[in-house]
Every structure is written in C-alpha cells, then in structure tokens.
Swiss-Prot record:
<keyword id="KW-0547">Nucleotide-binding</keyword>
<dbReference type="InterPro" id="IPR005893">
    <property type="entry name" value="PotA-like"/>
</dbReference>
<comment type="subunit">
    <text>The complex is composed of two ATP-binding proteins (PotA), two transmembrane proteins (PotB and PotC) and a solute-binding protein (PotD).</text>
</comment>
<dbReference type="Pfam" id="PF00005">
    <property type="entry name" value="ABC_tran"/>
</dbReference>
<keyword id="KW-0997">Cell inner membrane</keyword>
<dbReference type="InterPro" id="IPR003593">
    <property type="entry name" value="AAA+_ATPase"/>
</dbReference>
<comment type="function">
    <text>Part of the ABC transporter complex PotABCD involved in spermidine/putrescine import. Responsible for energy coupling to the transport system.</text>
</comment>
<keyword id="KW-0067">ATP-binding</keyword>
<dbReference type="GO" id="GO:0016887">
    <property type="term" value="F:ATP hydrolysis activity"/>
</dbReference>
<dbReference type="Pfam" id="PF08402">
    <property type="entry name" value="TOBE_2"/>
</dbReference>
<keyword id="KW-0813">Transport</keyword>
<feature type="binding site">
    <location>
        <begin position="43"/>
        <end position="50"/>
    </location>
    <ligand>
        <name>ATP</name>
    </ligand>
</feature>
<dbReference type="InterPro" id="IPR017871">
    <property type="entry name" value="ABC_transporter-like_CS"/>
</dbReference>
<dbReference type="InterPro" id="IPR050093">
    <property type="entry name" value="ABC_SmlMolc_Importer"/>
</dbReference>
<dbReference type="GO" id="GO:0043190">
    <property type="term" value="C:ATP-binding cassette (ABC) transporter complex"/>
</dbReference>
<keyword id="KW-0472">Membrane</keyword>
<dbReference type="InterPro" id="IPR017879">
    <property type="entry name" value="PotA_ATP-bd"/>
</dbReference>
Length: 372
C-alpha cells in the first residue's frame, strides 16, 4: 500500500541562521516538513537551498536556531549519528567495491552484525530493482543504475529522512524523465520523507508533493506544484516556474466581489480578483502561454481583442508555440496551443494579424506595487 504524507512534522527548522563571514545566507528561516512528504527545495543559484540541505545533513553548523527531527533536537548531533542520509549529485560510489559492498558500507561502519547485513542489502537492491547487479562494479553500470545504487546505499540504513542534492542533473534528458517517475514511486513505496534540492522547476513540478521556492534565503512561496504554477504569490515565483506573460492593467471599476472591469493592454474586459482595488490603480495580469487564445484576423477586421501580429512560430509536436507582437506597444507574448492538424487556422503564418484573448478566470492578478 502506498504511503501517504502524514500531518506530523518529521523535520522542523526553527529560526535558523547561517552566515559565511559577513555574508548571511539564511536568517530567521522556519520550515516544517511532514512525515512521508516528497518536498522539493527549489530556487536559483545562491538562494540558500544547498545551505539548508547541508545544515539538515549535519555538514554545516548553525549560527543560531534549531533543527528538530521527529521531536528530537539534533542541532548539535554529528552527521553520522543523525537518522538522515544524503544522495549527492556525484553519487560518491566506491569504484573498487562491488555494488553489494557499496550498499553494505554504511552498515559495516555502524557495526551491524554480519548475519543482518546480507538480507538488508539484498532488500535495498530489490527495492531499486538491481538485485542481480550485486557482484558488479559501479563502472559497469549506467548513470541511472548508479543513481539507484546510491539511493539503495542511503535507504539501507533506514533513515527517517533522505536528502537528494541535484541528484538527477548528471543524467541525459530521457533517463532523467524516467528517474523522476522512479524516484517518486520509490519514495511512496519506502514511506521515507524525501527532501530534494534542485534548480530545475520541471523536476520540482513532476515529483513533489510540495515545493518550497527560495529567493535570497527567504521562502518566496510554499505550496503544492499546482498551487505554485496556477496561483503564484508574486512575479518572481511566476517567472521562475514555467513561462509567463505579464500584461499591464488599469482598474476601471469593481463590478462584484470577484470581478473587476479593467483596461488590459487596451482591451476593456473583466478580470477576476478579490483583492481591494481603486479606480485607476495599476495591476499586473499574468497569463501562462496555454491560457491565451489566438484568433486570426483579416487586416481590416475589427476586434475587441488585443491586436498583434505573429512574428515567430515553433512546432513542438503536441503543441504549436507562437510569438505575438502587440501593435500598440511592441510587447511580445508567447502562446502555446495544442496542435490540431485538421484545423486550417492552427498553423499560423508569420505576419498573420491576430487578436489575443484568454480563457476567462484563468488569469492571475497581482498588485503592481508588490512586484518591484
């Protein structure tokens, strides 16, 4: 039976601070991770995500604050005595040892009785479907197999939390996609809390129960992949996760609790937001490429849509991506449509005049002042 995340924190970071010299990386940082969750700590280079992982692993010392593991304060517990294991980007397998000995290494260091070691190692190898590789050396394995061995070596110690540090980045695209699925299935099977650190937003969306997106040592947003993609808290989040188009808007009037009449790039239309607004207030309307609708127009045809022309198009198999340049200000937007070869209006020509609208209610509305 698949493990489901439980509403009980297995990890708590309480007001932690870490500096390197005069450079403060994280300050007054708080985070709780529930038992059985697959959490991805995501962010650009220098945001503090690797520092958080190293603090959890016990590879760095806190300046202040505390780390709680399953109700126990482990702030001053050395790395080797924490029930936390790490899979590094390099996998760090011993090339002179067999796969069996690589996986058994941690158990031998803990002086686990020999009669326990073999069944535990074989069980771990069975979990990652590499039991038949036990007598081989790491150099005889593919990158994906080496990654699974690194995971087996980590889980054989039965940790409460498994940390993964950019551990898919060395794989080619096809294998990386496969390993994303396998990691998620393995995490459900093992029932261990996984904390995955990456800068790759596609990996985060694909695998995670929850994403913690960092910016300059602070949590920019903490939520499910769907929440972060469909309801970004600010412009940084929207731009970091997927493609986004940002339209300038001016409030005309509030029509109801949820609906505001606005001028969006010259188009007078309803936008959906419950935030307090005033007449003439500046807003930003965020639209994903797949939220936008293109209508082909004759050169003299009237339309209430935002008018522009196709300046680029890219066929991507299932989708057609078009770049539209607005006539009124030269702004460019990206539009993604599911490709329908039977639709004569689908494959837009360069230079085609078009009207731009969007699926009503799919927009995200932000206060312009919040996104500086």
């Amino acid at each position: 039976m698949e493990n489901q995340p439980q509403n009980k924190p297995i990890i708590e970071l309480r007001s932690i601070k870490k500096s390197y010299g005069s450079n403060t990386i994280i300050n007054d940082f708080n985070l709780a991770i529930n038992n059985g969750e697959f959490v991805t700590i995501l962010g650009p280079s220098g945001c503090g995500k690797t520092t958080v992982l190293r603090l959890l692993a016990g590879l760095e010392e806190l300046d202040s604050g505390s780390i709680i593991l399953d109700g126990e304060d482990i702030t001053n517990v050395p790395a080797e005595k924490r029930h936390i294991n790490t899979v590094f980007q390099s996998y760090a397998l011993f090339p002179h040892m067999t796969i069996f000995e690589n996986v058994a290494f941690g158990l031998r260091m803990q002086k686990v009785p020999n009669e326990e070691i073999k069944p535990r190692v074989l069980e771990a190898l069975r979990m990652v479907q590499l039991e038949e590789m036990a007598d081989r050396k790491p150099t005889q394995l593919s990158g994906g197999q080496q990654q699974r061995i690194a995971i087996a070596r980590a889980v054989v110690n039965k940790p409460k939390v498994l940390l993964l540090d950019e551990s898919l980045s060395a794989l080619d695209y096809k294998l990386r996609k496969q390993m994303q699925q396998e990691l998620k299935m393995l995490q459900r099977q093992l029932g261990i809390t996984f904390i995955f650190v990456t800068h790759d937003q596609e990996e985060a969306i694909t695998m995670s129960d929850r994403i913690v997106l960092l910016r300059k040592g602070k949590i920019a947003q903490d939520g499910s992949p769907r929440e972060i993609y469909e309801d970004p808290a600010n412009l940084f989040v929207a731009r970091f996760i997927g493609e986004i188009n940002v339209f300038e808007a001016t409030v005309i009037e509030r029509k109801s609790e949820q609906v505001v009449l606005a001028n969006v790039e010259g188009r007078i239309c309803d936008i959906y937001t419950d935030m307090p607004v005033e007449k003439d207030q500046k807003l930003q309307v965020l639209l994903r490429p797949e939220d936008i609708v293109i209508e082909e127009l004759d050169e003299n045809e009237h339309s209430k849509a935002i008018i522009g022309h196709i300046i680029d198009r890219t066929y991507k198999g299932m989708t057609l991506e078009s770049t539209v340049e607005f006539d009124h200000n030269g702004m460019r937007v990206l539009v993604s449509e599911f490709f329908n070869e039977d639709d004569p209006h689908m494959d837009h020509s360069i230079g085609q005049r078009v009207g731009i609208t969007w699926h009503e209610g799919w927009e995200v509305v932000l206060n312009d002042e919040d996104n500086q």
